[in-house]
From Swiss-Prot:
Keywords: Ribosome biogenesis. Transmembrane segments: none annotated. Belongs to the DUF177 domain family. This is Large ribosomal RNA subunit accumulation protein YceD. GO terms for cellular component: cytosol. It comes from Haemophilus influenzae (strain ATCC 51907 / DSM 11121 / KW20 / Rd).
Length: 174
């Protein structure tokens, strides 16, 4: 199957009337905001999109995206590979006042001044939202063992260190 680059913007109304489906990719170097959020972008973003008109006569853009990235483990500070996958369903609106009228199953997305939506920006937003809050290896692959981790009780050597704010207490007494 041939790899096809996806357009940067689309006209969702025309695409929905034609019931268009897109299967393609965005190159890793096009996803600048995602690249700033991860250690490394390892693959192109594989994207599948479908445009259609639902029974309520609403234009709908439904899609899936998948990409491989390197994230920094917050336990051992070593990079590890993570596959980000997400699905989304949008319905374009002319302004945010119309967003309140949409069914809850659809996320609103606003048209630009040309009646198009920023497709690459939307896909990149979804990938950024799919990033884990605290990236970590699975415990069997992490270099930091459970014995080295502190869970609520300080080790004695840390508890015996002098409080750096004790100097402030002396100033308060003067």
């Amino acid at each position: 199957m041939q790899k096809v680059k996806l357009p940067l913007t689309v006209d969702p109304i025309k695409d929905a009337q034609r019931r268009l489906d897109y299967v393609g990719y965005y190159a890793a170097n096009q996803l600048e905001r995602l690249a700033e959020s991860v250690v490394n972008v390892l693959s192109d973003a594989q994207v599948t999109l479908s445009f259609y008109v639902d029974p309520q006569k609403l234009v709908v853009m439904k899609g899936k995206v998948q990409i491989d990235v390197d994230l920094e483990c917050q336990r051992c500070n070593e990079p590890y590979k993570q596959t980000l996958e997400c699905e989304f369903t949008y319905s374009p609106v002319a302004n945010w006042d119309q967003a309140d009228d949409l069914p809850e199953i659809y996320e609103p997305i606003e048209f630009n001044e040309f009646g198009e939506i920023d497709l690459i920006g939307t896909v990149e937003d979804e990938l950024i939202l799919a990033l884990p809050l605290v990236p970590m290896h699975s415990s069997e692959h992490c270099e930091v063992s459970a014995q080295e981790q502190v869970f609520g009780v300080l080790p004695e050597e840390l508890a015996k260190k002098p409080n750096p704010f004790a100097v402030l207490a002396n100033l308060k007494q003067k």
